[in-house]
Regions:
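Short, flexible loop segments at the rims of nucleotide/cofactor-binding pockets, characterized by
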Residues: 11-17, 39-44, 64-67, 115-121, ...
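Active-site HxH/HxHxD metal-binding segment of metal-dependent hydrolases
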Residues: 41-111
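Zn-dependent metallo-beta-lactamase
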Residues: 1-33, 52, 175, 196-199
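Short hydrophobic-aromatic micro-motifs
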Residues: 9-12, 34-38, 87-89, 115-118, ...
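Metallo-beta-lactamase
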Residues: 33-43, 60, 122-203
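Structural motif corresponding to alpha-helix initiation and N-cap regions
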Residues: 47, 73, 114, 125-126, ...
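Internal catalytic-core helix/loop-beta-alpha segment
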Residues: 102-133
């Protein structure tokens, strides 16, 4: 089921039995364009519903599928073909993708819908990127932080990093930005008070 989590922001999930978490995807309808982020697999009904939502916002055409990291490739190839849009990923993750990517970005770039790309160093993959929507005070993360417990954030298991301590320190970069909402690729997102939750985790 696809739901409107926030005005102009739709989400859907696929439950991972292995991880015991929801894998989350996003559709963002901007002022004059739309994007999909980290799409997990969709059932047939969800696929039709996603198409209906996109078609109903024809004045904001879908421009791209954006990936926060190489491991969130997921259903991007399917949606690339279905909607004839390019897949974008951080330049540092391009070579590791299973399928060929169309476009790359780097930290500091401004992408579709006004999204700011924030490079996060020393994470699970070299191209881990946060997507920031300044006007809406929304931060979007892939594997940098996950939501295992509602209202809280945590990192992936230590064996996913070359240096877990350094990876955690580098996440302090997120606190340089003002955000109320944190949308995570894995687990439960935080719609209010998200920056405080991130700060609490990083300072413990």
């Amino acid at each position: 089921m696809i739901k409107e989590t926030l005005p102009g922001l739709y989400s859907w999930s696929e439950y991972s039995e292995e991880k015991k978490l929801d894998f989350n995807g996003l559709l963002i309808i901007g002022k004059d364009e739309s994007i999909i982020i980290d799409p997990p697999d969709l059932g047939e009904n969800d696929e039709l519903e996603l198409k209906d939502i996109i078609d109903s916002h024809s004045s904001c055409p879908l421009k791209a599928v954006l990936l926060t990291n190489v491991h969130h490739e997921r259903a991007s190839g399917l949606l690339k073909d279905k909607f004839s849009v390019p897949v974008w990923v951080n330049k540092l993750d391009k070579e590791a993708l299973e399928a060929s990517t169309d476009k790359t970005f780097i930290g500091g770039d401004t992408l579709f819908c006004g999204i700011q790309a924030i490079q996060l160093e020393h994470q699970k993959s070299p191209g881990e990127t946060a997507f920031y929507l300044k006007d809406q005070q929304i931060m979007i993360l892939g594997d940098a932080l996950i939501g295992k417990v509602p209202g809280e954030v945590s990192m992936l298991p230590p064996d996913k990093y070359k240096d877990p301590a350094k990876a955690k320190v580098c996440l302090n970069k997120l606190l340089e930005y003002d955000f109320e909402t944190l949308l995570v690729g894995d687990g439960t997102s935080i719609l209010k008070g998200a920056k405080e939750a991130v700060k609490t985790f990083l300072t413990n």
